[in-house]
Amino acid sequence: MSEIVEPRTLSGFMELLPKDQVIFEKIKSEMEKVYRRYGFYPLDTPVLEDSRILLAKAGGETEKQIYRFNKGDSDLTMRFDLTVPLAKYVAKNYSELTFPFRRYQIGKVYRGERAQKGRFREFYQADIDIVGDGSLSIVNDAEIPSIIYNLFNNLGIDNFVIRINNRKVLNGLFDNFGVKESAVDILRIIDKIDKIGRDNVAKELVELKVPEATASQLLDVLTFDGSNEDKVEKLKGFAGCNEVFDAGFSELTTVIDYIAGFGVPADYYKIDLSIARGLDYYTGTVYETFIKNHPEYGSVCSGGRYDNLAEYYTKKSLPGVGISIGLTRLFYVLCENNFLNRELECP
């Protein structure tokens, strides 16, 4: 008799019992319904791509987390998000699409990071993106979080906040403080502030050769606490320091004003100058969404503006903005804390 192999699932991979899978599918269906209501079209892209396609703009932490392998003469990578495949898709099918192109995609992605609470190696993302041809109105940067607000309310989630920043504001501040040359590394360090805290971020900045006094002054700005109005006033003190900052500040305040205009209550969004987003392709507005009183789950929904992502696949200018819900993570948050809309639960 052959040896019995233990039936087990790899760490970081989700496998549900039927009653839980039913709930998961209902949540996914509700997301699709809301996305379609706002005029987004469904899209599905391959899980496997040529590594040159997916890694054209990767770098940094992303390259450390990818699943990459060779099959014959092919160098293949499993998709680590749904945004890079979208950029390739739009560039490839440009002549067949109508712009602004609004798409949603719900599918599995793969990252070889350490499995822990709220973090998986195989997980579902539920994305919406708006891609323009040549230009894309800043109004779209505000529409995205307003859609998330309405979707989360439909799911029965009430205790969340969308934290908003702008990469140009950050880059302008780095220039003002004389650390522009280290901007990419500083962004990655700041992106860890919720995980490792201000003191450890300051320590890593100093290790990066940022003067201790400069690191402290920079973090004083990025961690400044107060209302959205207070933070706008704080940032006004840097107006005119450089063109990049001024452009980002204008975009940030415009987005905040439009979010209010879309009817999102002030309790559900806030300016957070420490939000950086770890992926390298964001160029302007950035978002992260957190469940209040549950920091252990991290961001359940994040994204932002990317003006240059498609440049690796086409010479056309195809700016975009989008947001991605970590559906697998959100599912566990909803079920473990009884946040789920009763209509979505199993009978």
Q: Language-model segments: which ranges?
A:
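Short low-complexity, flexible loop/linker segments enriched in glycine and/or proline
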Residues: K57-E61, N176-G178, T285
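Short secondary-structure transition/capping segments
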Residues: P7, L54-A58, L173
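Polyanion/phosphate-binding surface patch
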Residues: L43, V47-L76
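Positively charged, Gly/Ser-enriched RNA/tRNA-binding surfaces
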Residues: D20-Y38, E49-D50, K71-D73, T83-E96, ...
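Acidic, His- and aromatic-enriched active-site or binding-groove loops in soluble protein domains
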Residues: T62-D73, G178-V206, I291-N293
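Auxiliary tRNA-acceptor-end handling modules of aminoacyl-tRNA synthetases
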Residues: M1-D20, N70
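Glycine-rich, mobile lid/loop segments that gate access to catalytic sites or pores
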Residues: I162-L173, G178
